[in-house]
Regions:
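Non-DNA-binding regulatory cores of transcription-related proteins
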Residues: 63-90
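A short acidic, leucine-rich amphipathic alpha-helix
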Residues: 36-42, 53
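Short helix-coil-helix linker/hinge
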Residues: 14-17
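Basic amphipathic alpha-helical segments that dock to polyanions
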Residues: 53-63
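Short capping segments at the starts of secondary-structure elements
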Residues: 27-33
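Short, Lys/Arg-enriched N-terminal segment that forms or immediately precedes the first helix
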Residues: 1-11
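Pre-recognition alpha-helix immediately N-terminal to the DNA-recognition helix
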Residues: 19-24
Length: 90
């Protein structure tokens, strides 16, 4: 199930930024940092601040829809949880 649909099924409102983050995570072939998500959204003309992206990622993690990864480079990255999983390249 697409991430945005899963959020909706859990009763969470689907804001423009939440939908955009969910769609980018769904389409990604790699685990993403918050900065990569912000840069992508800005390139798509979606204005979102860093706090919003971190808040959304926190919600997705609390709902067990994404997992936080530590790749050893000091950046936290996020990918779909195993229940939402599709293959990512590291």
């Amino acid at each position: 199930m697409p991430l945005a649909a899963e959020l909706k099924s859990r009763g969470l409102p689907i804001t423009r930024s939440r939908r955009a983050i969910a769609e980018f995570l769904d389409a990604s072939t790699a685990a993403l940092s918050a900065i990569e998500i912000i840069d992508h959204l800005h390139s798509q003309g979606i204005t979102v601040n860093k706090t919003t992206v971190y808040r959304e990622l926190d919600i997705l993690e609390r709902e067990h829809l994404v997992v936080e990864l530590d790749m050893g480079d000091g950046l936290k990255r996020y990918e779909l949880s195993p229940r939402q999983h599709h293959h990512h390249l590291f």
